[in-house]
Each structure stands twice: as structure tokens, then as C-alpha cells.
């Protein structure tokens, strides 16, 4: 079974989503299906078909989350050290073209959220950063052309 590296908070978020789906979404959709069934002929009952479609989505997401959680390999970034970029690191970068400073944490695929500053370990940027140190420059392929970043600092925890 493939292991999914992730941080503790990432695992907690997935577990919370799973609990929510099982305790709130699943019972609500079962009630919605029962209500739609009470309206009679199911062949032309849009509410029923919509509820069944939603149920299928919810059950699929539950199965996906259960698989991810069972294969999670939690890595605690606070136990890591050094100045080399690796999983869990907070990396301060400067975009060499715009001089804009950004900080990203390298996290697992299932917890990445660019708006929150968390990038997937499998993203082009993270792949180019892994193994590098402050002062190194990396070039990352982007839709508008390659972008260059200088690593300013690497932190853990």
C-alpha cells in the first residue's frame, strides 16, 4: 500500500472531514432520499436523482478519506532540523523577477493549499526546492515561462 506523507495537522483536518461526512452529511442525504421517495414516481423525480447523486459523491469521498487516512505517514516537522529543504520545511523565497518574498511549507499531496502557503511535495516548485539550501536559486517551469526563486531561509516546526 502506498504511504501518504503528511503533517499532523493535515491528518487531523482529513479526520475532521471524515467525521463530518459520516455524522452529518451521510444522515442528511439519507433523510433527503427518504423525503424524495415519499413524493412518488422515482423515474421522474429530480429531487430523488439529485439526492442519490449527492449520496454517491459523499460515499466516494468517505471511501477516499478512509484510504488516505489508513495509509498516512505522519511526519512531525518540529523534529526535523538543518538548513536543507525537505518535507515539512517552511521555505522563505524571493521571486527574482518581482522581488516579492513568499513563504511556503512543503506538505503532503492531500493537505496542500496554496492560499494558506502549503504546497504539495509533488508540485514543481517543491520538487525544485528539495535538497537545496539558503542562497541557492531554483528555476521552476510555470505557464507563463520559467520562474526563478532564491531561497532566503529554511525553518522547521
Swiss-Prot record:
It holds the Pfam family GreA_GreB_N. This is Transcription elongation factor GreA. InterPro entries: GreA/GreB_C_sf, TF_GreA/GreB_CS, Tscrpt_elong_fac_GreA, Tscrpt_elong_fac_GreA/B, Tscrpt_elong_fac_GreA/B_C, Tscrpt_elong_fac_GreA/B_fam, Tscrpt_elong_fac_GreA/B_N, Tscrpt_elong_fac_GreA/B_N_sf. Signal peptide: none annotated. The keyword Coiled coil applies. GO terms for biological process: DNA-templated transcription elongation; regulation of DNA-templated transcription elongation. Necessary for efficient RNA polymerase transcription elongation past template-encoded arresting sites. The arresting sites in DNA have the property of trapping a certain fraction of elongating RNA polymerases that pass through, resulting in locked ternary complexes. Cleavage of the nascent transcript by cleavage factors such as GreA or GreB allows the resumption of elongation from the new 3'terminus. GreA releases sequences of 2 to 3 nucleotides. Belongs to the GreA/GreB family. It comes from Acidiphilium cryptum (strain JF-5). Residues 46-73 form a coiled coil. PANTHER family: TRANSCRIPTION ELONGATION FACTOR GREA. Keywords: Coiled coil, DNA-binding, Transcription, Transcription regulation. The gene is greA. The keyword DNA-binding applies. GO terms for molecular function: DNA binding; RNA polymerase binding.
Amino acid at each position: 500500500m502506498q504511504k501518504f506523507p503528511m503533517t499532523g495537522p493535515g491528518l487531523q483536518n482529513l479526520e475532521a472531514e471524515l467525521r463530518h461526512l459520516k455524522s452529518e452529511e451521510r444522515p442528511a442525504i439519507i433523510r433527503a432520499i427518504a423525503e424524495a421517495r415519499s413524493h412518488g414516481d422515482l423515474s421522474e423525480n429530480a429531487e430523488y436523482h439529485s439526492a442519490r447523486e449527492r449520496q454517491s459523491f459523499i460515499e466516494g469521498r468517505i471511501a477516499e478519506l478512509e484510504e488516505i487516512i489508513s495509509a498516512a505517514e505522519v511526519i512531525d516537522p518540529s523534529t526535523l532540523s538543518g538548513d536543507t529543504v525537505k518535507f515539512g520545511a517552511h521555505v522563505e523565497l524571493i521571486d527574482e523577477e518581482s522581488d516579492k518574498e513568499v513563504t511556503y511549507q512543503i506538505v503532503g499531496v492531500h493537505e496542500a493549499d496554496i492560499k494558506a502557503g502549503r504546497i504539495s511535495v509533488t508540485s514543481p516548485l517543491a520538487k525544485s526546492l528539495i535538497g537545496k539550501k539558503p542562497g541557492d536559486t531554483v528555476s521552476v517551469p510555470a505557464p507563463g515561462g520559467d520562474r526563478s526563486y532564491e531561497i532566503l531561509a529554511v525553518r522547521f516546526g
